[in-house]
Amino acid sequence: MKKNLLQLVLLTILSISANAQYNTMTIPEAYYGTVGANGVTFNLTIKDTVKQFRTGNQTVTGSISSPNVKNNFWGPTLIVNKDDVIHMNVTNNLNEATTIHWHGMHLPAIMDGGPHQVIPSGTLWQPYWTVKNQAATLWYHPHLHQSTQSHVTKGVGGFIIVKDAAEAALAIPRTYGVDDFVMALSSRRFLATTNAMATQLIDNYGDYAMVNGTLNPQVSLPKQVVRLRLLNAEIQRAYNIGFSDNRTFYVIANDDGLLETPIAVTRLPLTTGERVEILVNLTSSTVGSTLDLKAYNSTAEIQLLTPGQSTFGWPGLEGNPTTPTGNNGPINGGLLNNTTFNILHINIAAATTGAITTIPSTLISNTYWTLADVTNTRTITVGGGNGGTAFTLDGALFTTTMVPKAVNLNAVEKWTVVNNNIFGHTFHLHDVPFKIISRSGGNIGTTVRAYEQGWKDSAWLPISGSITFIAKFENYSDSTWPYMYHCHALTHEDEGMMGQFVVNSSLGINQESGTTDFSLYPNPANDKIFINLKDASTEIYYVTITTVTGRVVMMLPQPEWQNGIDISSLASGVYILQMKDKETKSTTTRKFVKK
């Protein structure tokens, strides 16, 4: 084992020395949280920072850090297990409000982190939930309406890896950072005079590709089967993934879990917000050799996927105006637009001890909902975009007060999303995964491609195309806090291409609620404050703690209040605790003193 590790280290050093024009790809910290009596706790801090991307000025960025590693772009990879109860302590130290959405996670709407769960600057948000997802590659990112693009562009986000027993039983790579790698694919534009990243809504496409926030990245991969967890973390660009030697690779999972069998491909479309797990067999590669992961996004390559039409973006492919801006690349365009470009340079290193050397023939068994299970159908239509207007869903632009669609708890619904529009889009659904059952139009035929036949939460909508999927809205209901559905091109969602829905339960609608009267003790308090309910039948829906001037310092959705609320991080002073009742949604406030 020591010999193999030494070989790997030496080959990595030699490869880096021989490829000085490349930068070593950042591998985000694997963060397992802290195990306690009530579950697993993750402490995450969002902050403004800087990163040296290019020669000259540093670039102002944003990041998410754990207590272990202080990042300057992107955040740690959260490793969780199915059935874990996880507690998130999210502190927003940006100079502005934001949110954190747990993309792909099945959880209560009040914990979802969409545009409704705003975290003001200087505030601690404490959602928690039981992990019900099967093994999958998920991610987390800001979702503040009209600020999602700018916050993601700055680098705020990270991966979530969910593990379970079914995945653990498979003979596939799973040693993080050795034969199992997360890779967030994106690109950025930099202003020529300051090196600042372009974050305006018109900055849809980057000029320089990066992986995990690393420009011109390279990585050493062992001579064996490796697992790459790919995320399209772009603002708007889609990728047509392949390798420079046109090798076959194998799709084993998409957005929300493993497939039944590996799917062999040489090209793989990946649109914004989508994730895919692939296996690459490097056993026949020569140690010291190289290859590249590429985006085959040239006009000719794209039209191989959809004859006579672009796969991504406008009918004339990605935006490619000729008007220069004085920065890098054309306005609303990018130096990479309509081209085939390198994503990642790969150096082949020695195999590790216990290496996986074959691709499995089968994976897991999934049980999907069928048309026979459907209790309701819906059609959503994409509109807008003409003459520079914002894109819409069902003719409306999003507001937090718009009337949500109402879904019944445990309903199995069939949704058809129709894109008779001038642009391609990615449709993303919060709360639950869906199963695509058909496609139509868009020059891609009606067959759902094999690599997208698993559980999805994001799906590509080509121009003049539509998708139909089935989803079951189970486990969580909340008539107050909605979930979202929207285009995952960040510029489009920021402009209002979003809708919302609530999941209603028929139970408890007429249930009588207890009084919301309560007291706090001890008062003054030092480390914890306790709530004493006058009526034990009262259910606490939300607790917010503010200063006497109204600044929010703590947000606790459906708190586990019985063992006290931890206020040890608060400065000494007078605070106001606001408690919202679950049934009536009425709010009652009490003052307390922090010693």
What is each model feature region?
Residues 16-19, 510-521, 525-595:
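C-terminal outer-membrane/trafficking sorting elements
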Residues 245-256, 420-453, 490-491, 503-505, ...:
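Active/binding-pocket-proximal capping segment
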Residues 144, 295, 489, 579-581:
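Conserved structural position at the C-terminal beta-strand
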Residues 21-281, 311-366, 372, 378-384, ...:
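Histidine-centered copper-binding motifs that mark active-site loops
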Residues 376-436, 457-480, 486:
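C-terminal substrate/ligand-recognition segments
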Residues 304-307, 499-500, 587-593:
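Edge beta-strands of extracellular beta-sandwich domains
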Residues 1-21, 551:
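Bacterial Sec-dependent N-terminal signal peptides
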